[in-house]
Amino acid sequence: MARALLIVLDSVGIGGAPDADRYGDAGSDTVGHIAEACAAGRGDRPGLRAGPLHLPNLAALGLGLACEGATGRVPPGLAPEGPVRALWGHAVETAAGKDTPSGHWEIAGVPVREAWGHFPDTQPAFPAELTAALVARAGLPGILGDCHASGTAIIEALGAEHVRTGKPICYTSADSVFQIAAHEEAFGLERLYETCRIAREVCDPYRVGRVIARPFLGSAAEGFRRTSHRKDFSVAPPAGTLLDGLETAGRAVVSVGKIGDIFAHRATGREIKPAGNAACLDAALDAFAGLPEGGFVFLNLVDFDTEHGHRRDVPGYAAELEAFDRRLPEIQAVLKPGDLCVITADHGNDPTWTGTEHTREQVPVLAFGPGLAPRALGRRESFADMGASVAAHLGLPPLGAGQAWW
């Protein structure tokens, strides 16, 4: 019986979606613009990386050709040097969003059909009733922020006041999120999580996709820094995801990274949540090596997005892509005959773009495994085609959305 590994390179988009203009993202292209910046010398950082973007293993799987399908051009340095060794294509999202839950749920076969609730870019950003309910139920002296903000910028601006007053920092973005930042020691990590659980309930009537705990440490004198103890409190997806199908069939499932949070811990099997892309990939490979027949490992690599995309850090993003590329041989080595690996993304986050938000982009679809004949998949009209294809590969009943490419 076959096994499958699905890897989401968080935010690694490959060109603006057909409707990107509706989001202010027409012309965005995460991978393409990083490659162009590196080719022009704008991706260099002493001690980190230099020169053109070097992704020989991803190029051999068809990444450059997937980019060409999405934008009409192969990014600098991403043309394959020999025959492509995977099925390759690009996918567009049917859900009206460019957020993590929408992307992942659609990949898993359940596109979001109703619009998420969003908070206006005003100050205050949150309805007074929401804030009052959170303050009362969580026993808070008040909140700070109450605005759209970059997470790293707002803790630098308000971290000292937060420590002094005990008021958590609450902020949002263009995504459907309510984020709460608090000092792990001064406020307490478990107290932050409990505050977020309350906020999750308070935000439900507003159809907010995620409440996110953003713990940090440090001081005004030495600077504040986020820790690895982020936790997402998501709305549960509609029934019928690939994960639900696997659970019903009694299959082994391992969720690595923030997959458990994204799917509200429903049908996510054994959850492993290390810190950082490298540790997450280590955990996924270890889990896959011992995975029984018919099993599934679902991996999210979030550092592309959080550490580099939102921070508009081209050299850092390029280095992260190159680090993943170097480890592709390890991924290929754990695949046995009959196994399938799919590499994709959930949205874009072009580090050359304006602002600090996600970008509405198409995503790569790279599928490979021993014995799989390489071919072009073309444009997939929904991210759900990936979930449908994995389900078919694993011998599960068809999902409610998506067309398998088999």
UniProtKB/Swiss-Prot annotation:
Gene Ontology CC: cytosol
Reactions that this protein is recorded to catalyse: 2-deoxy-alpha-D-ribose 1-phosphate = 2-deoxy-D-ribose 5-phosphate; alpha-D-ribose 1-phosphate = D-ribose 5-phosphate
Keyword Transport: no
Pfam families, per database record: Metalloenzyme
Cofactor binding, note field: Binds 2 manganese ions.
Signal peptide limits: none
CDD domains xrefs: PPM
Positions contributing to Mn(2+) 1 binding: 10, 346-347
Cofactor dependency: Mn(2+)
Gene3D superfamilies for the chain: Alkaline Phosphatase, subunit A, Phosphopentomutase
Chief localization: cytoplasm
GO aspect biological process, one term: metabolic compound salvage
Entry keyword set: Cytoplasm, Isomerase, Manganese, Metal-binding
Binding site for Mn(2+) 2: 305, 310, 358
Record PANTHER family: PHOSPHOPENTOMUTASE
Family (UniProt): Belongs to the phosphopentomutase family.
Job description of the protein: Isomerase that catalyzes the conversion of deoxy-ribose 1-phosphate (dRib-1-P) and ribose 1-phosphate (Rib-1-P) to deoxy-ribose 5-phosphate (dRib-5-P) and ribose 5-phosphate (Rib-5-P), respectively.
Protein name, entry field: Phosphopentomutase
Species: Methylorubrum extorquens (strain PA1)
Lineage: Bacteria, Pseudomonadati, Pseudomonadota, Alphaproteobacteria, Hyphomicrobiales
